Regions:
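A short beta-loop-alpha structural element at the N-terminal edge
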Residues: 7-20
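A short helix-loop-beta-strand connector motif used in the catalytic cores of GNAT acetyltransferases and
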Residues: 43-55, 76
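Conserved beta-strand in the GNAT
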Residues: 55, 61-69, 76-81
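A conserved beta-turn-beta hairpin within the catalytic core of GNAT-like acetyltransferases
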Residues: 69-78, 87, 132-135
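Active-site acidic-Proline motif in GNAT/NAT acetyltransferases
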Residues: 70, 83-89, 117-118
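Conserved acetyl-CoA-binding loop-helix of GNAT-fold acetyltransferases
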Residues: 82, 88-101, 128
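Conserved GNAT acetyl-CoA-binding A-motif
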Residues: 103-115
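Conserved beta-strand-loop-alpha-helix junction that forms the acyl-donor binding cleft
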Residues: 113-122, 144
Length: 159
């Protein structure tokens, strides 16, 4: 495995979609939405937020990613992940730092994210780097019923 110094943190580009999606598909418990996570929607997101999303690259391969954007008032992180074999080496922290700096430069003062309550590793990571969970109710309203969420690793559990 590449040394941490050999891991590059780079802005996510539209051309990274296939490699980023392939990474998402390896993350057990990852929630992939049929429409929001399609090539078309991720490209639209990157075009709206051209400097804020990030990938981590080792030996020419994408091994981490974060979709990061802002509505002009608050920043948001989505789909934060690092390939299992590269975890616990500071890569996630470096990627989050990159995103936070980009948001700071845009004048954004607050950033949020959603971590599933059963995502023990993810929740431990966020606490470790100083994030606080909020006691808020999260509501969503589905505008398009085709935008179903599939959780990676759960495909065969119903059979």
């Amino acid at each position: 495995l590449a040394d941490t110094q050999e891991i590059r943190i780079l802005p996510m580009r539209e051309e990274d979609y296939d490699a980023v999606r392939a990474l998402w598909m390896t993350i057990r418990g990852f929630g992939i939405r049929a429409l929001d996570d399609s090539r078309e929607d991720v490209v639209r997101f990157i075009r709206r937020n051209p400097t804020t999303s990030v990938v981590a690259e080792a030996d020419g391969r994408i091994i981490g990613s974060i979709l990061c954007g802002s509505d002009g008032r608050q920043g948001a992180l989505y789909h934060v992940c690092v390939a299992r074999e590269y975890r616990r080496r500071g890569i996630g922290t470096r990627m989050v730092g990159y995103c936070m700096e980009q948001l700071r430069q845009m004048g954004i003062n607050k950033v949020s994210l959603i971590a599933f309550s059963n995502n023990d590793a993810g929740n431990a990571f966020w606490r470790q780097i100083g994030w606080k969970s909020s006691d808020v109710n999260y509501y969503e309203f589905v505008l398009n019923e085709d935008n179903i969420t599939r959780f990676i690793g759960d495909e065969n559990e119903d059979q």
